[in-house]
Amino acid sequence: MKFFVLVAIAFALLACVAQAQPVSDVDPIPEDHVLVHEDAHQEVLQHSRQKRATCDLLSKWNWNHTACAGHCIAKGFKGGYCNDKAVCVCRN
């Protein structure tokens, strides 16, 4: 029994040592790659802000109003509710 425990510990130590090998500092992306030459700072033309996530996603379990109120309280408002268009409306 002690032999099996010793072998198991030795195997675990060997696995830890094998996984702790240093990672090479060589960049695997070649210089002529398409993404390397693209401009890194491209302007975003239009943002898409989805305000219906809390009301739409949780409406199946009837938690939509609770989640909306919690979301509004976390933002610093007094509470909130989901209107008929499934948009969270926060109260002042």
UniProtKB/Swiss-Prot annotation:
CDD domains: DEFL_defensin-like
Chain positions listed as propeptide in the UniProt record: 21-52
Gene3D superfamilies with a match to the protein in the record: Knottin, scorpion toxin-like
Keywords: Antibiotic, Antimicrobial, Cleavage on pair of basic residues, Defensin, Disulfide bond, Immunity, Innate immunity, Secreted, Signal
Tree of life domain: Eukaryota
S-S bridge residues: 55-82, 68-88, 72-90
One Pfam assignment: Defensin_2
Keyword Isomerase tagged: no
Main location: secreted
Signal peptide: 1-20
Location(s), subcellular: Secreted
Any single GO CC term annotated in Swiss-Prot or TrEMBL for this entry: extracellular space
Induction section of the entry: By bacterial infection (at protein level).
InterPro entries with a match to the protein in the record: Defensin_invertebrate/fungal, Scorpion_toxin-like_sf
GO biological process terms on file: antibacterial humoral response; defense response to bacterium; defense response to Gram-positive bacterium; humoral immune response; innate immune response; response to bacterium
Tissues expressing this chain: Hemolymph (at protein level).
Family: Belongs to the invertebrate defensin family. Type 1 subfamily.
Function: Responsible for the anti Gram-positive activity of immune hemolymph. Expressed in the absence of immune challenge during metamorphosis.
Matching PANTHER family: DEFENSIN
Protein name: Defensin
UniProt organism field: Drosophila melanogaster (Fruit fly)
